[in-house]
Design a protein with these regions (language model features):
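Exported/periplasmic ABC-transporter solute-binding proteins
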Residues: 6-36, 40, 54, 58-62, ...
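Short secondary-structure junction motifs
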Residues: 41-45, 88, 182
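A short, gly/pro- and small-residue-rich
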Residues: 83-90
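Conserved beta-strand core positions
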Residues: 18, 44-46, 98
Length: 238
């Protein structure tokens, strides 16, 4: 599933629209980054297209009009890069790690990965081709915990919604999602020995008609200002 959003509501016939395909977990920081970038680059509108990294990689492979692609994992960026669809090598611009999320108030008193194996607990994730689903499987394997998920959501936002609404008891998401939830769910830390480092690469699509603006957007994210913005939303610097 792909969600599209403009970073600002201003309209101008002279504007260049920069199509940024970004992982769902980047929704909030990229929305703010888009607004900040537009202020520094009059005449450029940042159009965010959000979805699971696996879906976005497939869209780019199928010729979608993307200028920039930001993935929540290296594997999906590699799919694009291996087909020579990038203008230059991708770069890591942020990292993330995982947390368990539970319904506000933690009614089932979940405190560890082992608690997630309770057969009466409703656990949701995504398919393993979506980065958060793949990372979740890696974490559970490290911890020696076996779980049969009750449902598979299309992306990390789906996991958040299911748990926040009480339709599910628990899930595993990025730390940045817990920050963005602003108290709608509770986060439970996963020990470092079981956790992973999710690397977020970004690349410019080779057939972009706006290479200059695309490079400027990437440079903005890598700048101290862009990195501070990402950190504000729970991401780590690479």
């Amino acid at each position: 599933m792909l969600f599209s959003a403009c970073a600002s509501s201003s309209e101008s016939q002279e504007q260049t629209t920069l199509e940024v395909y970004a992982a769902s977990s980047l929704a909030m920081p990229f929305a703010e980054a888009g607004v900040a970038f537009e202020k520094e680059h009059p005449g450029v509108k940042v159009q965010l297209n959000l979805g699971a990294s696996s879906d976005l990689a497939r869209f780019v492979q199928e010729g979608a009009p993307a200028d920039v692609f930001a993935s929540a994992d290296v594997a999906n960026m590699d799919k694009v890069e291996s087909q020579d669809l990038l203008d230059s090598a991708s770069v890591i611009f942020a990292t993330n790690y995982l947390e368990i999320i539970v319904e506000k108030g933690n009614p089932l008193n979940i405190s560890s990965l082992k608690d997630l194996s309770n057969p009466d607990l409703i656990f949701v994730t995504t398919n393993p081709d979506v980065p958060i689903g793949k990372y979740t499987a890696e974490v559970l394997k490290k911890a020696g915990v076996s779980i049969t998920p009750d449902s598979f959501e299309s992306n990390v936002k789906g996991i958040m919604l299911k748990v926040a609404s009480g339709e599910a008891d628990a899930g595993i998401v990025y730390h940045s999602e817990v920050i963005a939830a602003d108290g709608q769910v509770e986060g439970i830390k996963i020990p470092t020995e079981f956790n992973i480092v999710a690397k977020y690469p970004i690349g410019i699509i080779k057939n972009t008609a706006h290479r200059k603006q695309a490079q400027e957007f990437v440079d903005f994210l890598l700048s101290p200002k862009g990195q501070a913005l990402l950190t504000q939303y729970g991401f780590k610097t690479p």
